[in-house]
Amino acid sequence: TNEHKFEAGTPRIAEAIGWSAALDWMDSFDLDAEHARLVKIASWVAKELRAMGMTVYGRHEEHDAAVVSFLHPTINSEDMAHLLDSRGFAVRTGHHCAQPLLNRLGITGTVRASFYVYNTREEAEGLVQELKEITEKFA
């Protein structure tokens, strides 16, 4: 018998080719070096945000992830995210699957910026600059 006659629909050929190309692209990176580069960027962003008077959650001096969660003392996190989005920056807001922790901290949500292999230092600098402008205008 031909077992292929029992498969419904078209095989996911394009998806398999795309997945293979994505894996090849990821193999082109030295992931340890990329991780170190991204952690350095996240640590710099955290330092800049603290200097602007924002609360940064996490220990960025011993940072092991390229993620910065922060909160401005007077600008709502959802408003901050909307303003950043309108300026071309994609961030996340809300509980980030950590609602019990945020409840314990007495906050309703944070803004989270995440950096990955396709992000540059210049983009991080642009994010910080936009946050400075937003803070000056709306705080």
Annotate the PLM regions.
Residues 1-139:
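Pyridoxal 5′-phosphate
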